[in-house]
Amino acid sequence: MQSTTSPMPPLPATAATADEIAVIAGWVAAGYPTGSGCSPVCTSGRTWRGGNDGSPEMNPGMACIQCHQASDEGPRFSIAGTVYPTLHEPDLCDGAPPSSGAQVIITGADGRTLTLAPNAAGNFYSETRVAGPYRAKVVTSGGERTMTASQTSGDCNTCHSLAGANGAPGRIMLP
């Protein structure tokens, strides 16, 4: 975290503050004690109960593209996912609302950007094709959270699930 040649988090992410570094250093100095863990929480207190009715707010947290391909219904998204306020939110829980001011910014390999605003369920999606591999970040007035590696799958919730998969720590989270 404090390296001048290879800082963590890597650029273009925002550098850790001195207070954040002190917390990590204290944890390391204490011998990496195991935390008590965290239970999933539906921060919004709202759960989707509408089934597969075709609403843009349907099935937050679920793998959108996988479902649309399997059912052969609905739009053919190139990018789709859900933004949440915390890392471990259950499937079908509404995510970050539009009032969060969040924008999901996708930058294709060709340098073109696609900016998406999450809806009332936190869902974002687009049928616009993106040149891969692409980069992604979530931006608010309070900062940005950037993926550290380029991606090739636009089905964001496949990896950004309750527990996380394929190296993702959990949900797509607001900065």
Question: Where does each model-flagged region fall?
Answer:
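Short, acidic Ser/Thr/Gly-rich low-complexity loop/linker segments typical of extracellular
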Residues: 109-121
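A short, solvent-exposed beta-strand micro-motif common in secreted/extracellular proteins
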Residues: 132-141
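Short acidic/polar inter-strand loop motif in beta-rich domains
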Residues: 141-146, 164
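Aromatic- and Gly/Pro-enriched helix-to-coil junctions and flexible linker segments
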Residues: 1-73, 80-82, 87, 91-102, ...
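Glycine-centered loop-to-beta-strand initiation motif
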Residues: 81, 118-126
